[in-house]
Every structure is written in C-alpha cells, then in structure tokens.
Amino acid sequence: MKKLTALLLVLAMLVTLAACTKKDEKKEPKDSTAPIETKAPAQLVDAPVLNINEIYGLSPEGQKATLANTLSLTDEDKAAVKEGNYKVAICMHQMDNDVNVMKVNTIKKILGDLGVEIIAVTDGQSSVEQMTTNLETVIAMNPNAIISIAYDVNAMVGIFEKVRDAGIKLVFFECAPTGFVSGQDYYALVSTDYYGSGRFAAEYMAYLLNYEGTVAMVYYDADVWTCNERDDAFRKVMDKYPNIKIVSEQGFADVSQAGTCADAILAQYPDVDGIYATWDVPAEEVMASASAVGRNDLIITTVDLGDNAARVIAEDGMIKAVGAARSYEDGEAIAYATVYSLLDKELTDRYVATPTQGVARENVLDAYANCYQVNPSDMIIEIWEAVYGTWTSPLA
C-alpha cells in the first residue's frame, strides 16, 4: 500500500510538470537591447525608487527612446489635423485587461477631440489569426493610419506588409514586425519601458528578501518582445545578487497554465521565498496556487496594475509590488504619434517610451491614479485608508 501511495504521488508531480512548457531549468537571458547591470550596489538600505523618471531599455532596433511627455501639438498642428478629415483604425491584440482598455479609450478621446474619425476598434482575442482577419477587414476600409501591435513579430510580417504597401501609415505600440525599419516601414513605435518594469519587479523582490533567498519565475514562453524584455531584466537584476538564486523557471503558453506552473515550482521547492510572474493575471494564478498549499507568506512581484493586483497590494497580500505601465500616458503618446504621422511631422527618435511606474503598498493609490487618470475603486481606497489614513487623490 505504501509503495502504491508513493507511486501515485510521483505520477501526480509528473503530470503537473508536463503541463508547463519548460521544466526545472534556468533560462539564459536573451541578448536584450538594454544595458546589462552586472554589479550589485555595495549597500542598499532604502526601498527602490517608485516614481521612476528614466528609460532603462532600448527599442528592438537598439534605439534610445524619446520620452513620451516631450511630444506636443501646436495650435497649427491641431487646426491642420481637424481640417484633414482623417480616418484611423485601432487593431488591438487583446481587450481583456485594464491596461489596454485605458489605452484605447485615451486614444479615442484625444483623436476624437482633434476631429479624427475612429472607423474601427478591433479585438484580436490573443490570436494571430483573428488579428490578421481584423487587419484585412480594416485595410479594405482605407484608413489614413492604423494603430496596432505585432502580436507575433514573425507571423504577422505579411499582413503588415500589406498595410504598408497600401500606403496606410503605421503606428505600433509595444511590438513592430521583424525586419520593419522605423521611419521607412512604419512611423513610430510607442511603448512602456518594459525592461524597466521587469527591473523594478526584481529590485523590489530583492529588497523584500533583504538580498538573499530563493526565487522562481512563471514566465510567458513566447516570442513577444515586451514580455521577453521584462523577463530578461528580472534575470539580469537577480544575477547581480550572489545570495539570491533563481531555482526554477516555468514557462506557460496560455495564461490558464500559469497556476499549473506555480504548482510545479511549489511542489519541487516548497520553501521558495518569491515568485515573479510576467504580468498581473498569471500572478493571480500563482497566488491561488500558493494559497492552496498554505504559502500565504510567498512574495510575488509582477508587471501591470490591474484592479485585482491593486487590491491585493493594498491589503498586503502576496503581490507586493509591480512595475506598472502609465497607461494614460501611453495612450496619449500613441495618439500624438499618430497625429505626427498624419501630418508628416518630424520625429527625431522613432522609439517613444514612458517610464515605468513603481508600485508598492505605500503608493498604490497614487500610482493607480497616475497610471489611469482615474481613482481606484472605493473598496481599494477603504482597504488602504484603514492602514494609512485618509487619502487625498492627486486628481482632485
């Protein structure tokens, strides 16, 4: 009977491991476009800076960034775009998260106020095939410009070549297709500094661990530049600290697998101190897995600030910190870059980036308001105020 029980336990663990795309191994950082930090500070006694004002990463082409807040429109620009009767389409890869919804709403508001007609907003539903179909439909509508993302930088080259060859201006956010050259094949690439986001998630975890312990990664196993950048930044930061070891990396191809990957890590390393996840939704799956085995003391850091992550941070749950996209500023920069393209306005550096917003419990309400330009829900505010006292919104 004991032998049978032991055999069943082994089989259960093997099934859990098989669900993840990577086994217990450390993935070597890719050749990131960002500078490599190779030396740990001699002493770190303060928490990492939350209000970050610099860009750490480079574009996929190795370009330095134009800060998004330097883009502006003159009165003459505004008048010209209103007189142009321009039509723009927005082709998204996914619309199931707060970050992308905010981007789209901001773009629509700014362009709409300038008299630009938004003729389509499409949802690719995290599918290259669906995005391709959407783009083909939009090309037939003959817009002046398309705002989109190369959700798969290789598989979507063909469809974006069709957009380019149709004479439609292209403004990308986050990812451009492989081989496309800024200023020639597309006008500009606008992105959050995702290298900076992964860097912050790593630095804050290291700080909470007092720079020693074991960590693991639940990462998105796909060729997506924005995800690869943050994951590689996490690895490189951890490599600086000799007393911190990444003991396991488990990759998922679909968010629904993230919990299974966390299960595998916790089965192999039940005492692991922290787990990083590529963004907040899989981080929630990691949290559920940890809770199921009584690991409520697990430290989780991630990227992106959805409402659930904000609530967990406010109540001092397992998610302790995130490197967040300044979604309103991202949307604003995308809209302005699109106007630049419509007017053939000069843009010296074609990579436009917004700095990461560092988020921890102490500043989660301010950070949320800064990222989205709306206040968090009353529930999140009440949770935070129970500890810190009355909050005054920076938007008031």
Sequence positions of predicted segments:
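A residue-level marker of the well-folded mature domains of exported/periplasmic proteins
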Residues: 20-396
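Sec-dependent N-terminal signal peptides of Gram-positive bacterial secreted proteins and lipoproteins
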Residues: 4-22
